[in-house]
């Protein structure tokens, strides 16, 4: 899977999680804002971690060295 497809998956999961929080934890406007902020922040942090690892594998800093005995 490519970078854009997985990014879209994270966006869809974030939207679904936000809707679930709005439906399941409906206690007032300020609590809803806090819950939505936490869900969006968690989704963005997970996406950033995945993106950094994915991009780091595209251009590794250390090139694998093959031994001649193998």
UniProtKB/Swiss-Prot annotation:
Membrane-protein topology: Multi-pass membrane protein
GO molecular function, one term: proton-transporting ATPase activity, rotational mechanism
Gene Ontology annotations for the cellular component aspect, listed alphabetically: Golgi apparatus; proton-transporting V-type ATPase, V0 domain; vacuole
Principal location listed in the UniProt entry: Golgi
One of the Pfam families matching this protein, by short name: ATP_synt_H
InterPro entries hit by this protein: ATPase_V0-cplx_e1/e2_su
Subcellular localization: Golgi apparatus, trans-Golgi network membrane
Domain of life: Eukaryota
Spans through the membrane: 1-21, 36-56
Keyword terms: Golgi apparatus, Hydrogen ion transport, Ion transport, Membrane, Transmembrane, Transmembrane helix, Transport
Keyword Metal-binding: no
Function: Subunit of the integral membrane V0 complex of vacuolar ATPase. V-ATPase is responsible for acidifying a variety of intracellular compartments in eukaryotic cells.
Assembly and binders: V-ATPase is a heteromultimeric enzyme composed of a peripheral catalytic V1 complex (components A to H) attached to an integral membrane V0 proton pore complex (components: a, c, c'', d and e).
Family: Belongs to the V-ATPase e1/e2 subunit family.
Protein name: V-type proton ATPase subunit e1
């Amino acid at each position: 899977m490519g970078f854009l497809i997985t990014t879209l998956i994270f966006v869809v999961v974030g939207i679904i999680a936000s809707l679930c929080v709005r439906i399941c934890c409906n206690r007032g406007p300020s609590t809803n804002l806090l819950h939505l902020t936490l869900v969006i922040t968690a989704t963005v942090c997970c996406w950033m971690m995945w993106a950094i690892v994915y991009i780091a594998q595209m251009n590794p800093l250390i090139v694998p060295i093959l031994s001649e005995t193998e």
